[in-house]
Amino acid sequence: MVREEVAGSTQTLQWKCVESRVDSKRLYYGRFILSPLRKGQADTVGIALRRALLGEIEGTCITRAKFGSVPHEYSTIAGIEESVQEILLNLKEIVLRSNLYGVRDASICVKGPRYITAQDIILPPSVETVDTAQPIANLTEPIDFCIDLQIKRDRGYQTELRKNYQDGSYPIDAVSMPVRNVNYSIFSCGNGNEKHEILFLEIWTNGSLTPKEALYEASRNLIDLFLPFLHAEEEGTSFEENKNRFTPPLFTFQKRLTNLKKNKKGIPLNCIFIDQLELTSRTYNCLKRANIHTLLDLLSKTEEDLMRIDSFRMEDRKHIWDTLEKHLPIDLLKNKLSF
């Protein structure tokens, strides 16, 4: 972080992308400006955005590979230049772009001799490789080579304990961090009481999303993080004086859903997708991450199941019920639903 004194002034709070470039398929750069900010605000925004960009942005990567009958990851396979460990490291570096949630399957199946690159990966329709030239292995002999892969969207750095996988399946330490680096600098403007600050933010990504997309997602995550403080009164939360005890409001979410289930006949609930329920993007993403794709998936969950979903909050429960209450009665009148 660099702080400098510069001359100039701005009249209204605004942000702008002042520079954007693509250095390579796996390196995007963007530079943004936010101003005017009061003294100290630039540091607050800069620190929060930097942490959110580096730790809260989701990415898609390969998390597991299955080679068949391979005794351990340090084995070598006849006709392949690289060891199993080297192939796993190459797979770890593959950059993928997608908006999927949950685990998906992919594969590689080729015949040598030839070089295997990222373009040889057979991916689900919603996933694509950012750089098809990324190397995986070199087949030096005319052999058939197949790998089964697992792909997952997550955030941060995920590790698994190494074991002797007798079925030839090996975990890959997933690095779901599409933002490579973030820098910010602060410039002070004005004189006396009219002094204000300008925040410059630099973002580098791996090509799976643009710096502008990363900035948008980080900002949205920060907003979601602070929403509970804004709605605490509306939710009817209360603290008892002089007692370290929190009394949450009564919520009959599961009871109401149970009542809904009793009256449904006709169209299968697995034909109604949660995309049709007009949920907020935050609630929708939480459900998708938990592999809840249809109304049947949603109604089969208990209240405890929902609250165990990562980042799922009390407001999300209320929002889901309000949405169901708004839309389902009409559907029930026209087409009685059933499981």
Curated annotation (Swiss-Prot):
Localisation per UniProt entry: Plastid, Chloroplast
Record-listed E.C. numbers: 2.7.7.6
InterPro entries according to UniProt: DNA-dir_RNA_pol_insert, DNA-dir_RNA_pol_RpoA/D/Rpb3, DNA-dir_RpoA, RBP11-like, RNAP_asu_C, RNApol_insert_sf
Cross-referenced CDD domains: RNAP_alpha_NTD
Region of interest (Alpha N-terminal domain (alpha-NTD)), ranges: 1-233
Principal location listed in the UniProt entry: plastid
Region (Alpha C-terminal domain (alpha-CTD)): 264-339
One BP term from GO: DNA-templated transcription
Molecular-function GO terms, alphabetical: DNA binding; DNA-directed RNA polymerase activity; protein dimerization activity
Keywords tagged on the record: Chloroplast, DNA-directed RNA polymerase, Nucleotidyltransferase, Plastid, Transcription, Transferase
Pfam families: RNA_pol_A_bac, RNA_pol_A_CTD, RNA_pol_L
Keyword Nucleotidyltransferase recorded: yes
SMART domains associated with the record: RPOLD (SM00662)
GO terms under cellular component: chloroplast; DNA-directed RNA polymerase complex; mitochondrion
Function (record text): DNA-dependent RNA polymerase catalyzes the transcription of DNA into RNA using the four ribonucleoside triphosphates as substrates.
Family: Belongs to the RNA polymerase alpha chain family.
Subunit (UniProt): In plastids the minimal PEP RNA polymerase catalytic core is composed of four subunits: alpha, beta, beta', and beta''. When a (nuclear-encoded) sigma factor is associated with the core the holoenzyme is formed, which can initiate transcription.
Protein name as annotated: DNA-directed RNA polymerase subunit alpha
Gene giving rise to this polypeptide: rpoA
